[in-house]
């Protein structure tokens, strides 16, 4: 059944028999089409001891299928028709996306259906992708100055027991200890049609997009049993102050405020945008580029259960670090 269309975007919605939700946005001005597959699973759904599983599957989903698609062939096939593909993991979702010429839409949908229904979760693929993720963590976090700043912020803002209290990149000890049975169970629990939203946007008519979605993704068998109930954690309100001393040439400062969840009607950019702008203006007005100060304006993370508003600088001198609290307080008023 088609849902209502918005005035800004021609959004046509349907739910397939297996529970998958589909959204089609026709845009005849585009020569290509984008396919986005959203799974409602992220690092917030990981159990203790399994930190990093959601992000691990971002990589495993490109490792081939039991139906004959070889490892890395998904990406190579998309690129062979002039398209691109990638994926991302966050706290509440994992997203896989392709952009292809309009004539390759069926190819992209077939590939998505194949890896949803027939993903090759094997010991060999697990071993390979585990090392890929560990190397990514070393390069982007462990061996980068201030690389774990956001991790410290999460722990300080939410606490280690909150679903948002650990980073999506995962834990190396947990990844090293991961066995095939645990990884397979995570996949079968969350990667199912009724936990997915397929979005098709670009050079495609609404009826054609919905028909093709049903042809390929609708053929994936429905899952049995209910999805797990997601646990909502409590946000910390004790406003901890964390100081880490390291042999780095300059000081990094970040402040974070708890904000309402994304479903809260108060959590709108229209309502809070002016305040965020004032905070950024305060930082920029007092920056000293010639002295190595590098202010970072407001950034926000709106999530299912809670959000954060972060502001700070990744490279400031001691006098600027001391004044950051006063200036951000002034911007909040």
Predicted feature locations:
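A structural supersecondary motif
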Residues: 254-258, 278-317
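Short amphipathic alpha-helices in soluble, non-transmembrane regions
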Residues: 110-115, 210-217, 326-332
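N- or domain-start disorder-to-order transition segments that initiate the globular core
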Residues: 2-31
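Acidic/histidine-enriched segments that form metal/cofactor-coordinating
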Residues: 39, 66, 73-186, 232-233, ...
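An aromatic/glycine/proline-enriched structural segment found at the starts
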Residues: 2, 160, 164, 168, ...
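Extended amphipathic alpha-helical segments enriched in small hydrophobics
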Residues: 312-333
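M16/MPP (pitrilysin/insulinase) zinc-metallopeptidase core fold and M16-derived inactive scaffolds
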Residues: 34-99, 166-167, 279-294, 307
